[in-house]
Structure formats: C-alpha cells, structure tokens
Amino acid sequence: MYIVKPSWLCHSDDQKKFEVYSVTVSPDNQRVATGGQDGKVRIWSAQSIRDSAKGDNESSDTPSNLSGAPAPGAKQLCSMATHNGAVTVVRFSPDGRYLATGSDDRVVLVWERDSTKVPRKEFGSSGEADTESWIVRKRLAAHDNDIQDLAWAPDSSILVTVGLDSGVIVWSGTTFEKIQRLDAHNSHVKGITFDPANKFFATASDDRTVQIFRYNRASATDVTFSTEATITSPFKQSPLSTYFRRCSWSPDGNHIAAANATNGPVSVVAIINRGTWDSDISLIGHEAPCEVAAFCPRIFARTKEAAEKKDKKSSSEKDKESDVIDVDAEPKVPESVPITVIASAGQDKTLTIWNTSNPRPVVVCHDMALKTITDLAWSQDGMSLFATSLDGSISYVQFEEGELGYVVSMEENESRLTRYGGGKEAAQIPESVEQLVLEEKVEAKEVKDSEKRMEELMGAAGAGSKAIASGATVIPSPASTVAAAAAAPVTTTARATTPLTAATSNPSTPAKPAKQKVTITKDGRKRVAPQLLTTTSSSVQGTLPAATTSSAAVPVASATAETIPVNDFSKPSYALPKGGVSTLVIGSKRRSDDLEDGSNGIQTALKKTRPDDDVPEYIAPVVVSPATTTSQVRLGAPKVRNLLMRSMTVRDAEKPRMANESVSLANGENTSSSSAPHSFNFEVRNGSGNDQTPTKVSVTRNSQVVFVDFVPYYVHLIAGNGCYFWATSAEDGSIVVYSPNGRRMLPPLVTGAPLSFLESQNEYLLAISSVGMLYLWNVVDKKAVFPPVSLAPILDSGSRYEDGGVLRGPHVTQCGVTGSGRVIITLSTGCGYTYDEGLRSWCRLSEPWWATGSQYWSATQLLGDESAKSRWVLAVEERTAEEAQRRAGGRGRYLKQLTRATLNREGYEGMEGVVSIAHLENRIAAAEMLESKHELRTFIIMYARRIAEEGLRSRVDELCRELLGPGKSQDSTWSPTVCGLDKHELLKEVVLKIGKYRESQRVAVVYGQAIGLLEDEVLGVASSSKSAASKGSKDKEDNEEEDGDHDMTDFKDAMSEQ
C-alpha cells in the first residue's frame, strides 16, 4: 500500500489552492471527477494518476480518442466552470454515461461527454488544454438551499439529490424530470446512499436521523415511495458541526455505514443492519466527528484459492453465513466467508480502513491531510481509493494484491444480492405460458388505451375548433340563483353558493377573478386578506375538485344546443351563509374539571358566560315551536324574504317519469314532444301572511304563465323543477307539492318545525327541519324513502358537554340529494356523510384524516366526461379539503410537517402506505353506497394496482374472488352487477391491470382463466412453444401445463364447493 499526492492533482489558480469537497470514479476506472470551492468540475485521467504513483508519467497533448478512453499521458481531461458557486458533490452514473454535479448555487447539472465536439482551452486559464468535451444535458433546479449530496440508483433509473433545504428530491434518470419531493427530515440533509439491490435508499440529516425509503417501480416513470424506517439511536448525541454525513451501503446489501454517529462520548461509524434497521456494531477509530464512510464496491476473500474457487453453495446455506464478526470474537474467520472493506475519514484528518475479518482497523493513516477530509471514492476494481480534503489536496491510495484480501468475481456480488431481489437474477421470471400471454394482453391494452386517449384529445380539439369557426350558438345551463330583488340580510359567498358538485355552465365563459378584500390600518398600511384558492375556481360541472394538485388536464364537454348536460345533484334552495348553517346541540355529558368543591364538600358546577356574538344574527328560527325547545338539535332557519325565485333550463325529453304531462302554451301548441330546451321561473312573492294579503306562487315557462296559486302564510323555502314537481315550505314547516302543471299532488306535508333545508333532484324531495330531523320522499311514487332521521349522530351531540346544556355544534356547509335518492351532508368539521337505508345508519364518506395521511388525497382522477354528473366522492372530498384549509388558516404546511413527523416515529413505519390503501378502500365503499359507477370503476382499478404493487396477494385474491362470484353454486346474496357495472367485466380490467406485476401474476392468471380471458391465446402460444422446443423442454412444458390444469381444477372445485 502506498499514498500519493501528485502536485498537479488539485484545484488551484494563480498559486492558490481551493478546498475540494467531492470526488468520484467512473465505472470503467478511466476518469476521476472532483469538485471544489473554485466552482469548477475537473475530470482527471485515472491512468495518469496511477502512472504518477509509479513515477513514469509522461505528459502528452494527444486528444482523446473516440473509443471513450482518455488520451494517453493526459492529466486533466476537462475543466467545467458552469456552476455559479462551490461544487459540493460529483457523482458518475453507474452506466458511466452521465456525471451529475451539485453546488451551493442550488442547481444540479447533468453532464455528458461529447466525442464529436473539439475541446478548447478555457479562456483566461493557465493550465493545460482540455482533451475532452463535456456538455450540460440537463439543469435541475428545485432545491431552495445548497445541495450537499446526490446518488444514482444502481440501474441509473433515478437520481436523488439532498440539500440544506431539508428536502429529498427524486428525479428520473432518463428524462431528468422531477418525480417527487420527500419532506421527511426536519433539518439539513447531508448524505445519501442507494441499496445495491435497488430496493431502498438512505438519507442522513442533521435532525440526527437516518431515513430508509422504499421505492417500487411499475414503469420508468411510475415510481412510488414510502418510509421504511427511521434510525435515531446511534445519532442522539452526534455533533452538528460536520460539513457532510456521507453514508454508504455494503456491496452485499447487508449493512449501511453511517458517518458522524456516537457511542457515548466517542465519535464512531455506525453499522446499520438491513431488515431490522438496528445498529449493534460501532467502528471506533476517530478522535473527531466522521464526515464520510465508504464501502468498497467489491467483495474479498481471505485467500487467493477461495477467491478463485467457484461458489457451489446453495442460497440457503449462504444466508446462514455471517458477514460481520463480533468485536469480542477471535479474528479468525473461515476462508469461505466473504469480506467487505470500509474506509472512513473526517475532521481528525485520519483515514481508517476496516474489513469484516478483523475487529480492529486494517490501516490507520494519521495526518493524511492538513484539514478535514470531505469525501472518499473507491475505484471499481476495489484496489485504489481517492480522498479529498479542505486543504485542497486530492490523495490517491493504491493497495497491493492481498492487503485487503483477494477480490472475488462480480457474480458473487450478484448472487448475494439475489436474496434481496437484486442482481441479474432479481427480475422475476414468468412461471407459465399463461403469464406471458397475460403480459402481452396488458401491453396491447396499454397501447390501445393510449391511442384512444390521443384520438379523443385530437377529436375534441377538432370539434372545438369547428364549433368556433362555424359560430355555433352555445346555450348555457344556468345554476339556481336568487334574484337580486330578494333583498335579505343573508350574506352569500362564492364558496357557500357552490353546489356539492359544481353546476354545469358554459365552459367558454371565463371565470371572473375573485376580488380580494383590502383594508387600510390606522398607520396607513394596506392589508390584503388572503383568498382561499378553492374559492377562486370556476364552478363548472365536470371539473374535478379544487383540492387536487396534479397538472393533468381534464377535458370538459361544451354545452351546445345539441347536448346539454343535466346536473344530477340538487341545487341549493337558497344561498347559505358564510360558514354554513349554525347548529346548537344539547350535550349529555358534563366536563369533570368544571367542578369545584364547595365549602360543605359538595361539588358544584362552575357558571360560565356565553358571549353575545355566539348567537347568529343572520339566521334564526322563524317561529318558536315547542318541538324546538325540547329538541336535542337546533338548526338555524332562513328568515322570510319578500321574493323567492328559482330559474332553470330543461327540455321535455328529460322527463322520464312525467312525459305525459304536456304543457299547453297560450297559442294552444303542445310542447310535450319537443326536444328544445325551455326556461322555467319558479317565483314566490310573500304577502303579509294572512287572508287579506296572501302569498303568490307562480311558475312561468318561456315567459308564459304555467300556473298561479295563493296561500295565506309566509313561504321561506322553494324547490323542484319542471320535470317532476314544485315544492314550497311554510314558516310552520308544512310543505305543499305541485305537479309541473300546478296540480296539488299531495296534501300539505307537516314536519312540526320550520325547515332549514328544502332540496330536490329528479323525483326526490329532501327536507331538514330546524330540530334536526331529515325527511326524504319519492314524490312520484308518493312514498317516504326511509323514516325520519335525526342529524344528532353526525353533529356529535352525545360527546359534547356544557353547563347550560346547549352549545354550538358544527355548521352544515352543504346539504343535497342525488338523482338516485342518496342524501349527502357536509359539515364545517370537514366530514361528509350519507344515510344508508339498508344499514339504517349514517356513514362517513370523507374526513380530514385522509388529507394528511393518504398519498392519494391530491391525486387527480380522469373519470371521463360521461361521469360529470356523478363524481360524488371526489366532490365530498373537495368540501373536506376546503374546510381543512379554512380551519388551518396559514398553518397548513406546518400541520403537514407535524403529521409527517408522526409518520416517521418508531412504531409507525409504513403507516402512510397503510393509510393510503385504507383511503382507497373507503373510496370504493363510498362510491358503491352513492351508486357512483364511474368513480367506483376508477377506484377499484386504482386499488387493484396499489395492492398488486405492494405484493398484497391475499387482498388481490379477495378482490378478484368478490368480482368473480360463487361459481356454479349460486349464492342468492351475490349480485352479478354493482352500481350497474358487470362484475366480470370489472374483473377483466383488474386482471389486465395487475398482470404486469409478476408478484401477483399467479393470482391474476387463475382468475383470468376462470373468466375465459386467456384460453384461446394460451393454446396458441403453448402449441407454438412445443413445436419449437427440444424434447427436454417439451417435457418441462408438459409438466407445467399439467400443473396448471391441476391448479385450475382445484380452483373450480373450490368455487363449486362454495
């Protein structure tokens, strides 16, 4: 072993040396790249450095050849000064094509050698001319502070960068697009290393933790990440004075060497075990904090014979061998046990080299540099080591054969990585012909779907251009509004009047920008009130919830005279106040800490005062009813207004149940068979509420009066449409229902208390009284969908307590009914509810927990234009997002970080993935309950894909079994359809979606055969395979087919037994 410091191997300018922060060696061992304080990336000839060590280096100006090898005799091959700050990290990609460099200018540059470009000497430099040309292929700018370290995946598929902004950013290794930012650390991130098995990567931070991230790739651009573990124990007392915390993963994948750890007061290198992620071994050999630890990329053997001997042991026997020797054990290791070597260095200016065959360091080089050693890089053959220092020096360490051991072949590395799913044998091979056929079907379907989406996009663009060019008239479908003449003390906002799913409107009409409220303080300063982003979005039916953040564009169908989308959700009967309708509940508990001991030892309740501003001013019950004073729930009700108006545009063709009720206009024309749209106005003018001045109720169609009625009481709520019925609500809670032509269909419905909500959709009429009772009727069938239900369970009245017995509950922010008769209510707590008739219970559709714990909360779903009328689940989640943002105020990001910190605590590993899967399962159940078939189909496909990615074969089997059904033994409880979707067709889509995940292919093939998805293709492929194979391969295929037949027979028998 010898150490060489060539005088020319440094970052210098005009006799001044600059600090050097990083070094890396190319995979072919021909180039060494360094980065320093001078802002330059320098590439050196590795051969020239080795020749300098031997003393026979000769200078040469011969340019680099085109084969990729540096010019013989050249020292500095290239100098690049593109960065605007000090270069803190340089790393070659494992395939040798790219060089990634990071700097304190917050930018990562990806370089590639250009053999066609003539190298030129840098202007103003006094050194030798470049012999190679490297150009910037990509500039990656996403960090907010200095970049400290970066690393490539073993297959160069992804690039991960870390920096002082506490961020971990993942980039594509092919397109260099940003894939994801992981905010798992709470302080500077100063080191990163990849698992050679290509399953994990680890990051080290000044928050005294090492985070282990698992990543799964379904394709080159489809990568999912989750936190596998958080290691804290070895770093609890680690100092924060180091420049870096560069860690390294062992070549066999068993261990991580983490720098800047402590064992009591002593600075050590912690060895972290894979799988358990604990640290029971510490390398003690430094007197000051360690900056960098680096495993040699090769595995060694103790003797030359052991290195040359071919390993014939089974993988199970290899697993039993231990790679790390206990410190207290004898330094005698069997020759068959492979050895790994690790180098470490830091602020004590000492280089220490260890191997797993000896409990003590193999080499300790004191005062190797004058200042801190910042980086270490091994050559790919494992026989040399490079070190950089803040004194400007770059050291080269050359080992002789046998000093560290004897290098074994790379097959040994790959064989040991196989147990973790790495190496050449990591790819799971298909087990049968059926799996190959399934993969072909999946690929063909993906290509077909891609072409179909492209055709739809091109077709939509063409149709839009044609419509504009021809000057076609676009007829909007206006949402229900309250006339400006109906002056009332109710303050309306854009958010409050937005329906649960946005109303269909003309997409060509630009949305007006929301005006921000500007106030001037006493000192003359202007203050602009923050505007909630979701309130500025256009309320166009068919757009996805504003809570989504994906950049994917969602096509919106234009509402022309030929096709007018119909809103399938009840429009609000009146403009809700800001924050929703207030509620008061009577609690059933008393707070224990509100009791104090009296003089006689008896506990008495503390009296509390209620501020006057807690009582809502804009909404109050219109009458005092005995039911209200004794009810457990009290809701605010709208005040009586002079004018109520409801406008809408419908067509007669949209009357599936009432088409026979034609409307005759004044000229005698019958319009029942017309398909043209008609404009309806439902108007109520309140009188004095007595017989002398009654209230006038009227409906007009295309400005022609349909009917007029008079009632001797105040009307404060209206609902209905021109297809099924009209409805009015009196101040005493009675409801009068009219047919589209004005006939009283029912006697007045008496609820016993004033109404707070009156909504309608299709044939359904929804009413909620001020005492919290919910009613739902099918007006056409003249039946109640279910008995009256109280809102008390969802207002959480049972867990509330107050001395006075009455306290403020959550506000009702939205209430409505779908076209299929499903009630949806959202509260100011962010939760959305529906009442299920079969379960006789309220069910929670959405809650703020999913927003903080699920990876799918902000995922945009392209459900297609045909589903614009039934995006109930996503619409409820939009309400949840709005309420969560409103309640968090400006602390949303802070609360998110707190949640992330919780997910990273010990015992909560993998929690985010579990919550994400649970969120998808909740979405599926909610979509099925709301009969939203388009959402149900999308969520099932998403769920199948996720559980297949996670390798949850039991859940994949459970999902497929439910869609397949009981087989021959017909089960009366099983239905072949769900929400109008054929379960077997859904199963085909699920099988094709999970078919590319080989961990789940065995399950997918069985169910694909059960529904006849693979029968014809399997016969064709099997016969062609038999004719082309040899006799031995034929016997093997016959055995595989026989086993497959037995599996299919067993599967069918199991189905018939059930």
From Swiss-Prot:
SUPFAM superfamilies the UniProt entry points to: WD40 repeat-like
Feature: compositional bias, Basic and acidic residues: 1046-1058
One Gene Ontology term, aspect cellular component: HIR complex
Skewed-composition ranges (Polar residues): 661-678, 687-696
Pfam families the UniProt entry points to: Beta-prop_CAF1B_HIR1, Hira, HIRA_B
A biological-process GO annotation: chromatin remodeling
Region of interest called Disordered, as start-end residue ranges on this chain: 49-73, 307-327, 500-536, 591-610, 651-696, 1023-1058
Alphabetically ordered keywords of this record: Chromatin regulator, Nucleus, Repeat, Repressor, Transcription, Transcription regulation, WD repeat
Annotated SMART domains: WD40
Localization terms from the record: Nucleus
WD repeats: 15-54, 82-121, 142-181, 184-223, 239-282, 319-364, 368-409
Keyword Metal-binding appears in the UniProt entry: no
Biological role stated in the UniProt entry: Required for replication-independent chromatin assembly and for the periodic repression of histone gene transcription during the cell cycle.
Similarity comment text for this entry: Belongs to the WD repeat HIR1 family.
Protein name: Protein HIR1
The organism's taxonomic lineage, starting at the top: Eukaryota, Fungi, Dikarya, Ascomycota, Saccharomycotina
